[in-house]
């Protein structure tokens, strides 16, 4: 057995701790810990292999330094041009710069990890100058931490004074995440209560039209901002379903959390969810607002005959991606790389 010490590197850890990339780093720490893999977050410490999560000058320097020391470099392909568009102010103008850095960084690495087959194919077709080994490993989820809890559910309902059927979603409130479509659904359903969980600290970074939605939402929509995991678990227990209207993802950790909580999941029918998420088998898929509305109403009104079977199948998807299993996959990949080291 090869003894491995891994440098997990993400720049701007504090700034982006509540983003998907920030959550992914937390999951890596947990996954490696569960598999007794030694790691460090400090690039000044010694290590055998570096696993980089972010794009940027500091990340590039870490890559170059590792190369100089003949240490293998893995880049995690969390960030793409496609999923950066429609996020913060000026993101569409900045997206080509993100693409430049993504190409430079991913081509500079020795090995890559993508969270889904969709992202692997996207990186292969649009980002790489030559063939490179890419391992598909989910960002994972801790299924033990996302179990429904009756007490947390009661506390949540009391805190937010909810007495209508509850629909929830989560994620940074970006246009790419489908926030404008979400609001249209909210306006159509005055007899339902909606909550969008996600960091409100970035509000000033959002386009004016999105800021206005957050500042003046419909009466039946609440933006609680970022909440601790206990409150989110309370929401999972209280909600009728999880509505995820995003237009572009590389996986979506919140999707895995909803499945772990055995909450009916309605997602947009986009390429990243092909094959592993199946409409009417382990989730519900919609292509437009009308379809989202119809599927949502049928779930709330308990019109789906095999709903329990669909929920259990969804839970199996999350179980396959439990962090302990994900950590074992990281460990196997690290050992494989060190055994075949040819840097």
What does each model-identified segment do?
Residues 279-290, 298-304:
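Conserved acidic donor-binding segment of nucleotide-sugar-dependent glycosyltransferases
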């Amino acid at each position: 057995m090869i003894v491995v010490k891994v440098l997990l590197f993400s720049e701007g850890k504090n700034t982006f701790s509540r983003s998907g990339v920030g959550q992914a780093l937390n999951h890596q720490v947990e996954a490696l810990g569960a598999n007794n893999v030694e790691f460090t977050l400090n690039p000044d410490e010694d290590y055998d292999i570096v696993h980089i999560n972010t794009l940027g000058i500091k990340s590039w320097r870490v890559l170059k330094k590792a190369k100089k020391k003949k240490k293998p470099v893995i880049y995690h392909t969390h960030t793409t041009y496609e999923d950066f568009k429609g996020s913060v102010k000026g993101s569409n103008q900045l997206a080509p710069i993100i693409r430049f850095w993504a190409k430079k960084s991913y081509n500079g690495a020795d090995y890559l990890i993508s969270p889904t087959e969709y992202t692997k194919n996207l990186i292969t077709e649009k980002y790489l100058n030559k063939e490179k080994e890419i391992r598909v490993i989910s960002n994972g989820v801790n299924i033990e931490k996302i179990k429904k809890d009756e007490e947390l559910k009661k506390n949540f309902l009391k805190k937010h004074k909810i007495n209508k059927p509850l629909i929830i979603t989560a994620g940074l409130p970006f246009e790419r995440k489908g926030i404008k479509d979400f609001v249209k659904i909210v306006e159509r359903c005055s007899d339902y209560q909606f909550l969008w969980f996600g960091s409100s600290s970035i509000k000033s970074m959002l386009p004016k039209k999105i800021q206005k939605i957050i500042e003046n939402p419909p009466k039946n929509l609440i933006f609680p901002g970022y909440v601790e995991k206990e409150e989110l678990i309370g929401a999972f227990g209280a909600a009728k379903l999880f509505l995820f209207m995003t237009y572009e993802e590389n996986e979506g950790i919140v999707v895995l959390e909803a499945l772990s909580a055995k909450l009916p999941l309605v997602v947009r029918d986009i390429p990243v969810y092909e094959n592993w998420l199946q409409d009417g088998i382990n989730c519900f898929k919609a292509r437009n607002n009308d379809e989202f509305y119809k599927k949502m109403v049928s779930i709330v009104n308990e019109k789906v005959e095999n709903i329990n079977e669909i929920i259990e199948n969804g839970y199996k998807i999350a179980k396959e991606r439990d962090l302990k299993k994900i950590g074992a996959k990281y460990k196997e990949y690290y050992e494989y790389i060190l055994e075949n080291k040819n840097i």
